[in-house]
Swiss-Prot record:
Glycans are attached at N27. This is Uncharacterized protein ORF3. Residues 1-18 form the signal peptide. The keyword Signal applies. It comes from Fowl adenovirus A serotype 1 (strain CELO / Phelps). Keywords: Glycoprotein, Signal.
Length: 104
């Protein structure tokens, strides 16, 4: 994924953070709201390797609530268990991930 694609993913993650449905409508079978379904569809269009970058960018951009939503999505998508380590990284690691993604 090129820089333009990464920027689009970053902007998408900011939009996701603004959706109340992302914060409150997670359940065991996925999202129940229309906006949630749209997010799941967009998630499905991203390859597993790119989805990890989406998770990192969304965590950086969105904070705790979207972080939990994405963690649930990670489980629903059956990605490798070691991928969850992204969610235990401290804020400094998030800043480093952002700097690595968008070098100045």
């Amino acid at each position: 994924m090129g820089v333009e694609g990464m920027w689009n993913v970053f902007l998408f993650s900011l939009q996701v953070a603004a959706l109340p449905s992302i914060k409150c409508s997670i359940n065991g079978s996925g999202f129940s709201s229309t906006k949630g379904r749209q997010y799941r569809e967009a998630w499905g269009a991203i390859s597993p390797s790119d989805s990890m970058e989406l998770i990192r960018l969304s965590e950086i951009a969105s904070g705790k609530h979207a972080h939990k939503a994405l963690k649930r999505l990670l489980a629903l998508e059956s990605l490798p268990p070691q991928s969850t380590r992204v969610f235990s990284s401290p804020r400094s690691h998030r800043r480093m991930a952002l700097a690595a993604t968008f070098p100045s």
